[in-house]
Regions:
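N-terminal FAD cofactor-binding segment of flavoenzymes
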Residues: 43-84
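Central beta-strand plus flanking loop segment that forms part of the substrate or channel wall
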Residues: 57, 171-207, 214-216, 238-242, ...
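Short FAD-binding loop at a beta-strand-to-alpha-helix junction that anchors the flavin cofactor
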Residues: 286-305
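Conserved N-terminal helical subregion
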Residues: 71-177, 185-190
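Glycine-rich FAD pyrophosphate-binding loop
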Residues: 22-47
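C-terminal helical "tail/cap" subdomain of flavin- and related membrane-associated enzymes
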Residues: 323-402
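Conserved FAD/dinucleotide-binding core of flavoprotein oxidoreductases
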Residues: 211-278
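N-terminal Rossmann-like FAD-binding beta1-loop-alpha1 element of flavoenzymes
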Residues: 3-30
Length: 402
């Protein structure tokens, strides 16, 4: 039987796309390498996702938001950009929610909660039949022609569909198998992520702190359920070789180290989760489409996390592609026509290019330690604090309403 659509990857992007297509009449199958248990009940991975107001609206439409649970959604009211260490002349720029039409700039939700909600929304009760989800499957080959796309699985089975969509991460093997090149930038840094409690309140404010030799981020979470103390997701970015010693430290030593790195500004910080590390690599696929093929989410554009736009941009790609597919199907047109795929590519690349380039520029500038770079970034923060129209533009970008 020929399928309408095969989505490779049942992470948040693939599952959200499958959910967006429910009730459209399209026959959709998801292929995932992980086990069904890992997809249904994803493990905590340390990552908190900053969601714009626009992304929250899309997630409500897809039925994900109501499945997250109120206690798993933390409001992000303000953002604070810092440059320079404690005890030095530290530059600050505050982006207030008062610069936006909403009572908060956005929201913070743990990645594993988003993954769980996406599975429940895609596979649970809802409009139209659920897609087919096949776990423990690996794609070993892909061929396309004017009529169909054919995927070969590790088991030797061949599947045929009118369109294949890659949603299998920024290191997408499906994209690579289609011969699509990608510009990849290794920033030479790894981020360590974990949850920590602290006695001083975070005031629902996210920090992005560009200190000398390190970058720190603080993402405000809801209070710790065990102690009631303020709790934050902590992100420490260092050169690759400097992360492992922090992962190997016992909890007491790690708490001391992180309290010191934050200059004691939050009081004594205490670990409240496992620690995780992720190398930072930016990816820009040179093409998002090919014959009977499209890429979404990180498989299309993999962002550096410094501007917190990765998942939000991925949701935008899903919204753009799903609407085009549904419209074509309802009009009796080919869902993988070259014209449709080219329009999707142009629309999403236009939406992503400026953000990707700006994010890359910021990430590059703030990893350089020579004196001119320090002067430049300090000057940018100080100028931004004085220039309200710039802060208003940043607030619009953070909310996704700009």
């Amino acid at each position: 039987m020929e399928l309408d659509l095969i989505i490779v990857g049942a992470g948040p992007a693939g599952l959200s796309l499958a959910r967006a297509l429910r009730g459209s009449g399209l026959n959709v199958t998801l292929l995932e390498q992980q086990s069904l248990a890992a997809v249904q009940q994803p493990a905590f991975d340390g990552r908190e996702i900053a969601l714009t107001q626009h992304s929250a609206a899309l997630m409500r439409q897809l039925g994900l938001w109501s499945r997250l649970g109120d206690t798993n959604i933390a409001p992000l009211k303000d953002a604070l950009v810092l440059d320079g260490g404690v005890g030095t002349t530290q530059s600050r720029m505050r982006i207030s929610h008062s610069l936006s039409p909403k009572p908060e700039l956005g929201f913070l939700v743990a990645n594993h909660h988003i993954r769980r909600a996406a599975h429940e929304a895609a596979m649970g009760e809802g409009k139209g039949p659920a897609p087919t989800l096949r776990c423990g499957e690996q794609v070993t080959g892909i061929r396309t022609d004017a009529e169909a796309a054919r995927l070969t699985l590790a088991s030797g089975e061949t599947l045929q569909a009118r369109l294949v969509v890659a949603a299998d991460s920024r290191h997408s093997s499906t994209r690579r198998a289609m011969g699509i090149a990608a510009d990849m930038h290794d920033y030479g840094r790894t981020m360590l992520v974990c949850n920590m409690t602290h006695p001083q309140p975070h005031e629902e404010t996210a920090w992005e702190w560009f200190d000398h030799g390190q970058t720190l981020a603080l993402l405000p979470m809801n209070p710790d359920p065990a102690s009631g103390l303020p709790r934050s997701s902590v992100v420490l970015t260092l050169p690759h070789q400097d992360i492992q010693p922090l992962l190997d430290m016992d909890e007491t030593a790690f708490n001391r180290a992180m309290t010191s790195r934050f200059g004691g500004q939050l009081g004594d910080m205490r670990l409240s989760s496992t620690r995780h590390a992720y190398p930072l690599v930016g990816v820009w696929a040179r093409r998002l489409v090919a014959q009977r093929f499209a890429a979404v989410g990180d498989a299309a554009v993999g962002m550096h996390p410094v501007t917190a736009h990765g998942f939000n941009l991925g949701l935008r790609s899903i919204d753009t592609l799903s609407k085009a597919l549904v419209q074509a199907h309802q009009g009796g047109q080919d869902i993988a026509s070259p014209q449709l795929l080219e329009r999707y590519q142009q629309t999403h690349q236009r939406a992503a290019r400026g953000l990707y380039m700006a994010t890359h520029a910021v990430a590059t500038l703030y990893t350089r330690e020579h004196v001119p770079a320090r002067w430049l970034r300090r000057g940018m923060v100080e100028l931004g604090e004085r220039f309200t129209p710039f802060k208003r533009a940043v607030a619009a970008s953070l909310t996704g309403l700009g």
